[in-house]
């Protein structure tokens, strides 16, 4: 066994979501798609979708048309985290990885698995912003990959292409993880992959498309990068049923667009209603909030109503340990548990 693996600790989440009435802890879509469309999809399924290995050619072409890229710019994977894993396998050989801290935890996991030094750059203590200039100070000759979630999780901030250009100018592969970009009014960097040969973008069907259970992710980059990343692909990247559902969502993208718009409007509404709370807004489909008692009463109310959320410490410099991260869903502000939160804690 590789000696460094002894230091890697993984956590398995076996939370039984059926015990909760509201699932708002992992940025998933908990609002069902319209029943008529779901029924239409179910009727489209055939036994062959389960019995045979999938042919992804047409699906890949549909993705490329949707994102206005060429097939040689796309790598399809079993979730975007497998795309990220394949990027580690392609570019890292025990060098160092530079990213923001906190961020998506799998960056650190993959750094450990591939025996890379993980350099997590903290947000500024005073401004609570991530300084790209400061981040660059940790990039050296041993840096093999720079990663930036954009918008970031859990902070929810966004960097423009001009802001990250100094990272791209290093010539080191730069991975921009755009898992939440659809909930932002900011631009995606996919259109820049022809301008920057070291730019890599990952996207997912899990968040805005509401298909987390399908495990379908995409990586976009220049043909040379994609050719080499694809050497680490699984024999069959995704299941036939997952492919068919995601293809259905692309064909009926107005369902996705409505959900995104409804989430963004609900997020604005909730920020107004929770003006008396400590709030960390985001460019994603969630917010963090805290109260004078570090969310002690919040937890009592949400537990009573069987609401599953996530509690965490966001900033390494913050004194409060128990920020509540809640996924924004259309109509969230009309739920009884939310009204009770406002009445009890405002």
Report residues per predicted region.
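Active-site phosphate-binding strand-loop segment of PLP-dependent enzymes
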Residues: 126-182
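PLP-dependent aminotransferase-like
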Residues: 89-148
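Phosphate-binding glycine-rich loop
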Residues: 57-96
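PLP-dependent aminotransferase class I/II
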Residues: 32-33, 198-273, 277-280
